[in-house]
């Protein structure tokens, strides 16, 4: 991976976007993990690590992240029609109602937040329309703040991993130290996935996420739930 140079200003912006304190509701989603723990598929730190590594290697998060990159570029170039296209494309690519709704809810929350703290973004938000996927909203914010796209992608994947590890810590359960150890172990793969995703062409966008989709569908009727997905 190339060396990334950020000004203090840009570094602080991306830290804010990737923070678990960002009020977009990410903490309320497990992306099917709750069902996988309930069924006994994920029972430990090692099985959670295997699941997250598989998702980073060929799962739906790669598709989502690739669309984030394209939306960032469209925002920088002022290509609103392209931005709307990728928003619709990502909505169509969601395989379950829970996954689609979670992306829309987080995207809406982020755009509403940005509209209040950075009102000049409102015109971009309005041009995308509603519903807006979270990856699109994240891309708009990163581009508006002129954060390096590679840094933005790293932050996006790291934030995703942090959220699911936090869910795993609660559900399995795991200790906080185990969660941080797992996040550290995922760093090389997050870095590698970033390089791969940055180089993908449009006709190479694909994923293998049937496990996630089945878990998400089963979660919709799961009797006892802590999470919304």
UniProtKB/Swiss-Prot annotation:
Subcellular location: Cytoplasm
Keyword Ligase applies: no
Entry function: Required for maturation of urease via the functional incorporation of the urease nickel metallocenter.
Higher taxonomy: Bacteria, Bacillati, Cyanobacteriota, Cyanophyceae, Nostocales
A cellular-component GO term for this protein: cytoplasm
Location (main, coarse): cytoplasm
MF GO annotations: nickel cation binding
Protein name: Urease accessory protein UreF
Family: Belongs to the UreF family.
PANTHER family in alphabetical order: UREASE ACCESSORY PROTEIN F
